A protein has these predicted regions:
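Conserved, mostly hydrophobic/aromatic
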Residues: 53, 61, 82, 113, ...
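Hydrophobic faces of well-ordered beta-strands that scaffold small-molecule active sites
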Residues: 5-9, 57-59, 90-93, 121-125, ...
Length: 385
């Protein structure tokens, strides 16, 4: 049954204009002072979520985002800071883009965050999706297979480091430790100092393609999966595929177990008002994520139309109403959201986690109002039984 509510905040600053008639995504530029407001915005979101009993604030690691959409470069540093401002809320790494790190540096930094926050930092790994970020840090992104090979070896190393008193690794990309003399002996193994105190380390990863290779790798390391904002019907293939992988790995998972299902939402007194209020933010979401492949079902011609000011209807760009009808976005009153979530419980009896998130571009004031409203009128229907 659903019992844990979270949200995903990718780190957008408040934008002065939004929607299809507003500044095109690639033309947005902001001052350093304005980009830095992402931290005060994150603090406000964390305090609000902590007050209303949320489980986890998932933050996204991104770099070089002068457009103002994803402006948090280091989740682990921020997690330590947020732990001083909150009493219960966990900060989730959604996600540490592993190919941009040395695996042992990432393992060390997470271990420090785990200890300093008293276990309120949740580990998460991802392969990345921005060429500007991953390739700039010297890792492959355009070559998907090379990216996956590197990622899997890195995660293997991280898990060895987390869970072993000492370890060694020899692979395609890393030989750890190197064969060097050290204080009179030949180096044969390493120890992560200190290791995380919470063992085994809870780890999450996004489920995107839901390939058998990717899911089997997750199950091998007992990695849980976040399925991003999309209709349950769209996510159904991934949900069943994850359970199948768990069964192949010898785990008797119920359908939905080990997963968190994501939904974009906006509450209002009526569906019509909710749709009207969030349409500009939805359109900004399409402008940002469409070219990156995260707007399900959009065609190349529709994508081309979405890069221009206006004319989206003529170009056939999917509307918010379309995604609301299929359940990818929820727009309406709290009682209807409660009913929708209960249908998900019935369909996926192992589902405990959901992450309900505001659209890219949603102003801070609105995000705080929505999080509080959800916490008061939706979450108690699931957390107090």
């Amino acid at each position: 049954m659903i019992s844990k509510f979270s949200t995903v905040y990718a780190g957008h600053v408040d934008l002065p204009d939004m929607g299809q008639m507003a500044t095109p995504a690639n033309e947005r530029r902001y001052s350093n002072d304005h980009l830095a407001t992402v931290f005060s915005k994150t603090e406000a979101i964390a305090r609000c979520m902590d007050e209303h009993g949320y489980s986890t604030l998932w933050l996204a690691e991104h770099h070089f985002q002068r457009e103002g959409y994803e402006c948090l470069p280091n989740i682990l540093m921020l997690a330590v800071h947020l732990a001083h401002l909150t009493s219960r809320l966990r900060t989730g790494c959604g996600f540490n883009i592993t190919p941009m790190w040395h695996p042992l540096r990432l393992a060390e930094d997470y271990a420090a965050a785990d200890i300093l926050t008293g276990g309120r930092t949740v580990f998460g790994v991802g392969r990345g999706y921005h060429t500007r970020e991953v390739e700039t840090f010297g890792a492959p992104m355009l070559d998907a297979e090379a990216n996956r090979d590197l990622f899997e070896e890195q995660v293997d190393i991280i898990m060895k480091a987390f869970h072993s008193e000492s370890f060694a690794h020899k692979g395609k990309h890393y030989t750890l430790p190197p064969a060097v003399p050290y204080r009179g002996y030949e180096l044969k193994d390493l120890t992560l100092v200190p290791r995380p105190l919470r063992q085994p380390v809870e780890c999450w990863q996004p489920v995107v393609s839901a390939s058998a290779r990717g899911l089997d790798f997750m199950i091998k390391h007992r990695i849980k999966g976040l399925i991003g904002g999309g209709a349950a019907t769209m996510a159904e293939k991934s949900i069943f595929a994850y359970q199948d992988a768990a069964h192949r790995g010898g785990l008797d998972y119920k359908l939905g177990e080990g997963l968190s299902l994501g939904i974009f939402y906006h509450l209002a007194e009526s569906r019509e008002r909710a749709v009207r209020e969030i349409t500009p933010w939805y359109e900004e979401h399409v402008k940002m994520f469409g070219p990156l492949g995260f707007v399900p079902g959009i065609t190349p011609s529709q994508l081309e139309a979405s890069t221009k000011r206006g004319g989206w209807d003529a170009g056939g760009v999917p509307t918010l109403e379309h995604y609301a009808r299929v359940g990818a976005w929820f727009a309406g009153p709290p009682e209807e959201l409660v009913a929708y979530l209960k249908t998900l419980e019935q369909a996926y009896p192992g589902l405990e986690h959901v992450h309900l998130s505001n659209s890219m571009g949603t102003p801070q004031k609105v995000m705080l109002e929505q999080l509080a409203w959800l916490g008061k009128e939706v979450m108690p229907e699931f957390t107090r039984r």
